[in-house]
A protein has these predicted regions:
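Short, charged, surface-exposed secondary-structure boundary motifs
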Residues: 136-144
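Hydrophobic transmembrane alpha-helix segments characteristic of membrane transport
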Residues: 145-149
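Soluble N-terminal domains of membrane-associated systems
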Residues: 1-128, 135
């Protein structure tokens, strides 16, 4: 039996500031609700995509796991004052999730370098088996058109 925790980290707490959701968020339903609230509050927020990526990994692990395996998903939130304060919040929330779920391994789903700064915090408490960086794809044609239009209006 292997217990895997899928983690999404919001180090600067956009989830709390923009959507009014406090971390930790634990469980598939609560995580999906949080992602929707953040996506509605700010459709351009990249943390929404990272959270959806965590849900994707959670669901794929459930599909592939044995019936004796456990899989859970959680969002850890930091603080708008990124640094020691946000890292302490993430550590405290991770300790709570570990106490409740007792994972053997973790999968970290992130949207970039800022959230990846939490890797030492997470790896000091649970083994990270995989790190997935979610990067939103955009149409090159749209990007080029926007760039050229911005040059015209300088």
């Amino acid at each position: 039996m292997v217990r895997t925790l899928v983690i999404s980290v919001d180090r600067d707490n956009d989830l709390g500031v923009k959507a009014g959701v406090r971390g930790p968020v634990i469980g598939r339903k609560a995580t999906l609700t949080a992602a929707l609230r953040l996506g509605i509050a700010d459709p351009e927020e990249s943390d929404t995509n990272a959270i959806m990526g965590a849900l994707h990994h959670h669901d794929r692990l459930i599909e592939k796991s044995d019936s004796s395996d456990g899989v859970e998903v959680a969002i850890l939130t930091g603080d708008v004052r990124v640094g020691p304060r946000s890292d302490r919040a993430i550590a405290s929330q991770l300790d709570e999730v570990i106490r409740l779920f007792q994972p053997d391994t973790a999968v970290l789903v992130t949207d970039g370098a800022e959230d990846e700064a939490s890797i030492p915090i997470i790896s000091s408490r649970v083994r990270i088996d995989h790190i997935e960086k979610i990067i939103v794809r955009q149409s090159k044609g749209i990007e080029s058109t926007y760039y050229y239009l911005s040059l015209i209006h300088i």
